[in-house]
């Protein structure tokens, strides 16, 4: 069996991953094979030599100092040339063996060294490779660092410094320093320089080269880059491990393993990442210079696992990106549950928003001690998928129940069957009225029969009545579920009752309720099927074994979205519009009588915002869409504690600062999400490990640090996220901690409205967070003195049905607090249906008087928390769902045309917000003025001064 190995050694570096806030700081030093077979110690992300076509013209003038110090300048120090015949030695290889070199001496600071202006010889967005031969002389003890750096100067902004590379140098030995850089834009002046050793140590430089490695613009013009070109070199290991390295572990090339039981799925070889001590250890390749920003790539890896008695584990493809400002970013491309039995494909897409000085793709994931096997890896420009057409749904039969014998009118359970060995029978005495949510959808309806199914002899929670509905479902139709349920006597604890659907092997939640009494309860839910199932059934389940279940009037019917929106338009007119009378002054009324008036609303005051991320704002196209279409923002992760303090005492507010600066400079209001997160899985390990006293101190420091830093800058704060679903801080610090968090936050920033925030409030799917539980939770906080000022409904919803959402809003509205949808997203594989869902949710919010704003949880493909939920494709094309967003927002703008009456006035009815009015007199004189229609129920009289017309 052939074996080739590459080894490495590691120390901890920071890995900032959204999906895993507990990654620790780590640095990696690896030993990788170089061209002559020797091994050299290098940084973990510096050990791959990219194989890229290049222009060999050297950017550096006088690269070998054969012209003395021509074009070179010492930076606040001195420099002199040592030639081969000088007879001078600095303890390194003699000049006769290495030729001329420069000595940089009398250095008083580490940054002092030798520099050259290269402004006229570099271009933006190109990749350059730097190679320098350096040494040190003088009072050297141990290793000395030498660095290559760029100084970027602009007259109108502070000087920036871009790190290129560094190497460790021993005394009396020449060492090669290599690295790469790319400039996203060209500053007024670019200076390359070498620096680094401690003061008093001389820096010796034999030669410096900077070569163009990649010019994307030229390659596009010459047709060098083709759509199906694989960016990965040696993707199938036909050339052994060339161009590959271990990410802080050893990698081995095999043609077989396990006595021939493991062989390549394709090709003749595969690689194994072995001796892994961290889950992020794996196999990697550098693809710097090959990846264009704002372009979508698809990565496909064929993987499996081996060893350590692990038979199944998550394997992930990840991209490490280093930006020119040295900010690291980790992008999760795809993950798959791999086994030790067979090869499996791990496939996903990625996009770089900003410029990158380094890009490395690697495979990671399984627990330490388990080998990752990689058969092949490809990275190609992703094909554009054409949008799917709107589904053709014939005869949707809105409001028609698809179930058989729902009313049990013949006194039998015909059409139903027991799931399990329970017993079904028919009894009388159930409600004859429709459940409220169904009544809102169906309107006037004949009474129910009053009969119900009694389910007895239940020995498992899943036992209950069931019915096959495979042939009755239509793809892409949204169905509403409605039923009355009741439990038999003898229950001694709260019981969940659930309407469930079995769609092939998938469980679908059709609604749940918690019951702790002997009354009838409504269950309301919804679902949609987007792929033809081979088997579909509906069943009712949930109570403990031995508890009898009663089911009455179960209905499943398609909902008429357009009819609901028509109703919501009328409702919105009542609460979001006002009668407006424009009174024109400053000009004689007789001159204005009959003048033409054109009123155009420029901005609706109803807040519509979105989630953004630090990496996204590096993408100009993203920022353009964001600023044009949203007036509020929330940060996806960058304000969360696990992001701002991943390790104790190591604070990172820079990302949040950058995002806040973008928003404030463009008059975008912001929500602060979130100060704390009550779910334990989201809490950093260093916090989880604290004792009670230390944790209490850390909580107070978090409040003080965050709220003082951003005082007055965030309009809202989600104080302690998802308290209905988590209890970490309450369990550790007692019940009063939640109230104290609110009190302290209010003391530190009285201007901010403090919100509770949770999920599954509006969809009937989770008894833990039904509106009644949320109300109870809020009242409990308020009674103990917590200044709760707003209700956050996250809104991660599937197949929304208006009356179900509205029912939750009505119940929460009794508290009199402003309600916001704080993280709204919808999902469908069909863009048109996704747009339908978004339209439903936007109108339900806009049409309800208790709702005061909507925040989308993102809009850009590859930067969403849910699949098939984006509104704009990754390369900037607005899809059908995005077009629906724009159409709804356009509907929320009022326009009016007419003439000024004899009293110098013009009346219209319009949505609240900002307006422009153009007045054109009979003599064709024009004037343009602006005004604001404020919220209010009564008619508003607004004076418009036309003086000067």
Indicate where each model-derived feature is located.
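Extracellular and organelle-lumenal recognition/adhesion modules and their flexible linkers in secreted
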Residues: 2-15, 22-609, 616-629, 669, ...
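Acidic/histidine-rich catalytic cores of soluble enzymes
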Residues: 208, 377, 554, 751, ...
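Substrate-binding cleft and catalytic face of glycoside hydrolase catalytic domains
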Residues: 308, 632-646, 655-762
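Short, well-ordered coil/turn segments that N-cap beta-strands
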Residues: 357, 604-608, 629-631, 666-670, ...
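Aromatic-rich peripheral "rim/lid" segments of glycoside hydrolase catalytic domains that contact
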Residues: 565-566, 571-573, 687-690, 695, ...
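Aromatic-lined carbohydrate-recognition surfaces of secreted/lumenal glycan-active proteins
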Residues: 607-613, 719, 741-771, 820-823, ...
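Acidic-and-aromatic substrate-binding clefts and catalytic sites of carbohydrate-active enzymes
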Residues: 611-621, 641-654, 680-681, 724-734, ...
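Short, acidic/polar
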Residues: 614-627, 697-706, 768-781, 835-844
């Amino acid at each position: 069996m052939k074996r080739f190995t590459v080894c490495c050694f590691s120390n901890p570096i920071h890995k900032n991953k959204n999906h895993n806030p507990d990654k620790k700081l780590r640095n990696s030093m690896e030993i990788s094979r170089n061209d002559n077979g020797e091994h050299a110690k290098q940084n973990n992300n510096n050990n791959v030599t990219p194989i890229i076509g290049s222009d060999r013209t050297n950017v550096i003038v006088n690269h070998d100092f054969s012209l003395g110090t021509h074009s070179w300048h010492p930076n606040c120090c001195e420099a002199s040339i040592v030639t081969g015949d000088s007879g001078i030695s600095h303890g390194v290889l003699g000049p006769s063996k290495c030729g001329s070199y420069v000595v940089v001496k009398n250095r008083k600071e580490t940054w002092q060294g030798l520099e050259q202006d290269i402004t006229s010889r570099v271009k933006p967005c190109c990749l350059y490779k730097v190679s320098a031969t350096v040494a040190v002389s003088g009072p050297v003890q141990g290793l000395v660092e030498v660095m290559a750096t760029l100084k970027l100067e602009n007259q109108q902004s502070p000087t920036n410094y871009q790190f290129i590379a560094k190497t460790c140098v021993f005394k009396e030995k020449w060492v090669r320093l290599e690295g790469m850089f790319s400039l996203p834009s060209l500053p007024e002046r670019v200076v390359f320089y070498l620096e680094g050793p401690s003061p008093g140590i001389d820096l010796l430089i034999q030669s410096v080269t900077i070569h163009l490695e990649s010019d994307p613009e030229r390659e596009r013009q010459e047709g060098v880059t083709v759509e199906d070109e694989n960016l990965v070199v040696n993707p199938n290991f036909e050339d052994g491990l060339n161009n590959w390295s271990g990410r802080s572990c050893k990698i081995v090339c095999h043609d077989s393993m396990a006595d021939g039981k493991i062989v390549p799925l394709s090709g003749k070889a595969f690689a194994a990442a072995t001796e892994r001590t961290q889950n992020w250890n794996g196999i990697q390749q550098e693809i710097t210079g090959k990846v264009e920003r704002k372009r979508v790539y698809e990565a496909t890896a064929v993987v499996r696992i081996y060893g350590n008695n692990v038979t199944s584990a998550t394997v992930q493809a990840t991209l490490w990106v280093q930006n020119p400002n040295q900010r690291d970013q980790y992008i999760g491309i795809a993950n798959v549950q791999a086994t030790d039995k067979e090869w499996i494909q791990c496939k996903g897409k990625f996009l770089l928003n900003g410029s990158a000085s380094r890009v490395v793709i690697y495979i990671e994931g399984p627990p330490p001690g388990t080998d990752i096997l990689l058969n092949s890896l490809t990275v190609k420009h992703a094909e554009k998928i054409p949008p799917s057409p709107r589904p053709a749904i014939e005869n949707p039969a809105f409001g028609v129940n698809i179930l058989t014998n729902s009313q049990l009118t013949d006194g039998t359970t015909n059409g139903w069957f027991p799931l399990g060995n329970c017993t079904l029978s028919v009894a009388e005495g159930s409600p004859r009225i429709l459940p409220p949510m169904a009544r809102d959808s169906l309107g006037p309806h004949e009474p129910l029969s009053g009969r119900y199914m009694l389910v007895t002899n239940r020995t498992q929670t899943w036992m209950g009545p069931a019915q096959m509905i495979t042939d009755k479902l239509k793809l892409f139709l949204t169905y509403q579920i409605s039923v009355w349920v009741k439990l038999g006597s003898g229950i001694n604890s709260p019981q969940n009752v659930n309407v469930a659907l079995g769609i092939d092997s998938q469980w679908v939640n059709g609604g749940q309720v918690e019951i702790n009494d002997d009354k009838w309860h409504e269950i309301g839910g919804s679902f949609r099927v987007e792929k033809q199932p081979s088997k579909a059934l509906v069943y009712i389940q949930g109570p403990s074994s031995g508890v009898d279940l009663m089911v009455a009037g179960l209905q499943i019917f398609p909902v008429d979205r357009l009819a609901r929106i028509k109703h919501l338009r009328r409702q919105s007119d009542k609460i979001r519009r006002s009668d407006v009378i424009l009174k024109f002054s400053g000009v004689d009324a007789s001159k204005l009588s009959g003048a033409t008036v054109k009123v155009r609303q420029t901005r609706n005051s109803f807040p519509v915002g979105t989630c953004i991320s630090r990496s996204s704002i590096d993408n100009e196209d993203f920022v353009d869409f964001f600023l044009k279409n949203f007036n509020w923002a929330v940060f996806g992760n960058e304000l969360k504690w696990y992001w701002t303090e991943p390790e104790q005492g190591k604070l990172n507010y820079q990302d949040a600062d950058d995002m806040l600066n973008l928003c404030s400079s463009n008059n975008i209001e912001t929500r602060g999400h979130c100060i704390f997160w009550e779910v334990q899985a989201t809490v950093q390990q260093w916090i989880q490990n604290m004792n009670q006293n230390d944790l209490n101190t850390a909580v107070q420091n978090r409040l003080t640090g965050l709220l003082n830093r951003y005082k007055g800058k965030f309009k809202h704060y989600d104080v302690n996220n998802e308290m209905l679903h988590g209890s970490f801080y309450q369990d550790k610090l007692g019940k009063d901690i939640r109230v104290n968090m609110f009190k302290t936050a209010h003391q530190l920033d009285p201007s901010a409205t403090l919100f509770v925030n949770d999920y599954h409030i509006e969809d009937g799917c989770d008894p833990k967070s039904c509106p009644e539980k949320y109300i109870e939770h809020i009242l409990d906080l308020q009674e103990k003195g917590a200044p709760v000022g707003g209700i956050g409904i996250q809104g991660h919803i599937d197949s929304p049905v208006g009356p179900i959402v509205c029912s939750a809003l009505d119940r929460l509205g009794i508290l009199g607090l402003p309600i916001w949808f704080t993280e709204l997203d919808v999902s469908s594989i069909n863009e048109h249906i996704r747009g339908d869902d978004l339209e439903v949710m936007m109108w339900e919010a806009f049409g309800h008087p208790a709702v005061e704003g909507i925040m989308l949880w993102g809009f850009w493909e590859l930067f969403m928390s849910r699949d098939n939920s984006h509104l704009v494709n990754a390369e900037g094309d607005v899809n059908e769902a995005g077009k629906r967003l724009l159409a709804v927002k356009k509907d929320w703008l009022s326009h009016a045309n007419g003439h000024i009456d004899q009293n110098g006035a013009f009346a219209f009815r319009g949505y609240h917000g900002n307006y422009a009015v153009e007045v054109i007199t009979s003599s064709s004189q024009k004037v343009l003025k602006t005004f604001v229609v404020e919220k209010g129920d009564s008619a508003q009289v607004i004076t418009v001064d036309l003086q000067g017309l």
